[in-house]
From Swiss-Prot:
This is Neurofilament light polypeptide. Residues 138-234 are annotated as: Coil 1B. It comes from Homo sapiens. It is linked to Charcot-Marie-Tooth disease, demyelinating, type 1F: A dominant demyelinating form of Charcot-Marie-Tooth disease, a disorder of the peripheral nervous system, characterized by progressive weakness and atrophy, initially of the peroneal muscles and later of the distal muscles of the arms. Charcot-Marie-Tooth disease is classified in two main groups on the basis of electrophysiologic properties and histopathology: primary peripheral demyelinating neuropathies (designated CMT1 when they are dominantly inherited) and primary peripheral axonal neuropathies (CMT2). Charcot-Marie-Tooth disease, axonal, type 2E: A dominant axonal form of Charcot-Marie-Tooth disease, a disorder of the peripheral nervous system, characterized by progressive weakness and atrophy, initially of the peroneal muscles and later of the distal muscles of the arms. Charcot-Marie-Tooth disease is classified in two main groups on the basis of electrophysiologic properties and histopathology: primary peripheral demyelinating neuropathies (designated CMT1 when they are dominantly inherited) and primary peripheral axonal neuropathies (CMT2). The lineage of its organism: Eukaryota, Metazoa, Chordata, Craniata, Vertebrata. Residues 253-271 are annotated as: Coil 2A. The modification Asymmetric dimethylarginine is found at R23.
């Protein structure tokens, strides 16, 4: 019976407590947080050792199973005691491991939360420091683009000017050629006039020669008529003489004499006819030669006139072509000049617009920086108030342990009224930032560094604006006044800081043993300082 009761205990409760529990724990570890595996695995050696013990024990128990019937109750009690001690040890180790694992998980969660907080702060700081640089990079890129556009426009203008000079040189060459053609035309016109005069003279000479030919032909015809009439008269006389001789003189024979006379007259007539024909032929040849010469001269003059007209027409066409080319080039040059002027004016308008946008953006950036500085001053004032109230509360708490309840309530009401006035004064002006004594020196130095950085960025932006636009005389005087006022304010702040440091040193030497009266006096002095600083700033603003 004991053997049957021992085996179920070993098979169920032992496995459930020593095997299933670590498995459930490990599965929860995997699902809960994966980063703790290394930590858990580093501390899981006892579990494996316990498992090895269980395996060895189970193997030994398996080997002892046939002889369990021979065991007595004392051996069973010893084995159960050993198992209980092993269970308690393993349970303690598992509890330790669970506790350490829970602590590791809590630590990891804390580190993750801290990491998230630090990442948020880093993101905020990066945004704060990257916004001005991003704007600056954008405007610098825009300025570079505008400068490149201006350089391109200048290069294009120079190229157009070179092209214009080339066109002007071509125009001058064409004008010189035109003048040469005009001179050659005038010369040709002069030669044409001379040729026309020669042609007119040749025509007149030809007309005169034709008239002389007509007169000579008339004279020839007249001489022929006269010659024929003379021949007729001579024949009539000869016939009459023959008749009269035949009638009157019958004695002598006159036929021979008449024949001689007729022969003489015929010879004389033939000679005269021959002389007249020779004279006519010579005269006709002379007139023909002169007419031919005049015809050749007229033909040459006509040819020269036609050639001159042809040359004049060609030169006129060439002059018209040059004139059209000149007009086209002048029109193209005017269009190029108009286009260039329009492009330059458009680029200038764009540059002016971008400069105005840059100027407005710089002014907005300066305004934003100023607002940021004001907000920073307000934040510092609020931090100072919080620190002052904290110090008051700490002082009140320390005072509560030594004073009665009535004195604590009265002192607390008086101190709260005093510090309420001081807090109101701190909100009114930013000079309260450097006049408090309860603010930590490290935080004040850090805030002063931030203020200095903001002022440097504002001064750099103003310097860039001053470089972009030359200041006038009134602006230069205002800038000098602003610089003097800034130097005076810095000197006053340095003096106040030195006074505060000396007062803080005195307070540290005194060991913080101030009472309510001293605190009220200090608060009143701080209020007076704040009011004096506010009045000084108001007077400066009025000036």
């Amino acid at each position: 019976m004991s053997s049957f009761s021992y085996e179920p205990y070993y098979s169920t409760s032992y496995k459930r407590r020593y095997v299933e529990t670590p498995r459930v724990h490990i599965s929860s570890v995997r699902s809960g947080y994966s980063t703790a595996r290394s930590a858990y695995s580093s501390y899981s050696a006892p579990v494996s050792s316990s498992l090895s013990v269980r395996r060895s024990y189970s193997s030994s128990s398996g080997s002892l199973m046939p002889s369990l019937e021979n065991l007595d109750l004392s051996q069973v009690a010893a084995i159960s005691n050993d198992l209980k001690s092993i269970r308690t040890q393993e349970k303690a180790q598992l509890q330790d491991l669970n506790d350490r694992f829970a602590s590791f998980i809590e630590r990891v969660h804390e580190l993750e939360q801290q990491n998230k907080v630090l990442e948020a702060e880093l993101l905020v700081l990066r945004q704060k420091h990257s916004e001005p640089s991003r704007f600056r990079a954008l405007y610098e890129q825009e300025i570079r683009d505008l400068r490149l556009a201006a350089e391109d426009a200048t290069n294009e203008k120079q190229a157009l000017q070179g092209e214009r000079e080339g066109l002007e040189e071509t125009l001058r060459n064409l004008q010189a050629r035109y003048e040469e053609e005009v001179l050659s035309r005038e010369d040709a016109e002069g030669r044409l006039m001379e040729a026309r005069k020669g042609a007119d003279e040749a025509a007149l000479a030809r007309a005169e020669l034709e008239k002389r030919i007509d007169s000579l032909m008339d004279e020839i015809s007249f001489l022929k008529k006269v010659h024929e009439e003379e021949i007729a008269e001579l024949q009539a006389q000869i016939q009459y003489a023959q008749i009269s001789v035949e009638m009157d003189v019958t004695k002598p024979d006159l036929s021979a004499a008449l024949k001689d006379i007729r022969a003489q007259y015929e010879k004389l007539a033939a000679k005269n006819m021959q002389n007249a024909e020779e004279w006519f032929k010579s005269r006709f040849t002379v007139l023909t030669e002169s007419a031919a010469k005049n015809t050749d001269a007229v033909r040459a003059a006509k040819d020269e006139v036609s050639e001159s007209r042809r040359l004049l027409k060609a030169k006129t066409l060439e002059i018209e072509a040059c004139r059209g080319m000149n007009e086209a080039l002048e029109k193209q040059l005017q269009e190029l000049e108009d286009k260039q002027n329009a492009d330059i004016s458009a680029m200038q308008d764009t540059i002016n617009k971008l400069e105005n946008e840059l100027r407005t953006t710089k002014s907005e950036m300066a305004r934003y920086l100023k607002e940021y500085q004001d907000l920073l001053n307000v934040k510092m004032a609020l931090d100072i108030e919080i620190a002052a109230y904290r110090k008051l509360l700490e002082g009140e708490e320390t005072r509560l342990s030594f004073t009665s309840v009535g004195s604590i309530t009265s002192g607390y009401s008086q101190s709260s009224q005093v510090f309420g006035r001081s807090a109101y004064g701190g909100l009114q002006t930013s000079s309260y930032l450097m006049s408090t004594r309860s603010f930590p020196s490290y935080y004040t130095s850090h805030v002063q560094e931030e203020q200095i950085e903001v002022e440097e960025t504002i001064e750099a932006a103003k310097a860039e604006e001053a470089k972009d636009e030359p200041p006038s005389e009134g602006e230069a005087e205002e800038e000098e006044k602003d610089k003097e006022e800034a130097e005076e304010e810095e000197a006053a702040e340095e003096e106040e800081a030195a006074k505060e440091e000396s007062e803080e040193a005195k307070e540290e030497e005194e060991g913080g043993e101030g009472e309510e009266g001293e605190e009220t006096k200090e608060a009143e002095e701080e209020e007076k300082k704040v009011e004096g600083a506010g009045e000084e700033q108001a007077a400066k603003k009025k000036d």
